[in-house]
């Protein structure tokens, strides 16, 4: 029988529940060991129980008391930035690695197609944000061709897809995404904006990426972006370019550098969710959980092969 790594998910909200269903359906080398929440009436805990997953509504302490905790080899945290600091401290004492889906960013930022391999052995990795997972690959693709002086992303998500955790973390979202645009995407300066779109019926997740780089070949930049999109599609099938990449050779004022001539690149993206738990318009959740699943599968495969 093939050995699998048992995982626990802390957080029975939208992200945690969607991730659980992905693990149950497409886990590969990982399997569910526990679903953890703090609301006994949450739909996520109810679904987990119906699907035969051990559950607790007593948070981290409840997880530690579960008979099967000793077999848990990896924990996903889909709660909040503040809660993750507490969870990480306790689980680090017990030697249990974590994948952090909050903006806490205790560990390194990880975007699977950009730097997943480099951090495969880390004990705590951070999945940035939904906007970061969607847009940082594009910034990195431009960075592979030319020096990126500035990158700005605008993530527009359906208001209905934003649960209480997302709403509570708006400030952390912008700060974490901005830092990761620089640290992972390779931009010298990054900025992130999130928009909760109240439109009805809800619209798909849309992301706009602007970069200003050193002069470069438009065809090389476009080819790099298209190759990166294909890599992301390997684990997020609903990820696509909304239209062809747009370019403008222009001159802008950069802080400390004066007027600089370069290439402005504009990329419009759409992320359609897989509808494992929430509707297709919740691509913002799908890309986070899909990226986290990809990282967990890579870590599990490495551990099992060791």
Swiss-Prot record:
This protein's encoding gene: dmpF
Active-site positions on this chain: 130 (acyl-thioester intermediate)
Keyword Oxidoreductase part of the UniProt annotation: yes
InterPro entries the record matches: Acetaldehyde_dehydrogenase, Acetylaldehyde_DH_C, NAD(P)-bd_dom_sf, Semialdehyde_DH_NAD-bd
Molecular function GO labels: acetaldehyde dehydrogenase (acetylating) activity; NAD binding
SMART domains reported for this sequence: Semialdhyde_dh
Catalytic activity: acetaldehyde + NAD(+) + CoA = acetyl-CoA + NADH + H(+)
The family this protein is said to belong to: Belongs to the acetaldehyde dehydrogenase family.
Keywords: Aromatic hydrocarbons catabolism, NAD, Oxidoreductase, Plasmid
Top-level taxon in the UniProt lineage: Bacteria
Enzyme category, top tier: oxidoreductase
Pfam family, one: AcetDehyd-dimer
Keyword Cell division listed: no
GO BP term (any one): catabolic process
Binding site for NAD(+): 12-15, 161-169, 284
Name this polypeptide is given: Acetaldehyde dehydrogenase
Bridged cysteine pairs (disulfide): none
Enzyme Commission number(s): 1.2.1.10
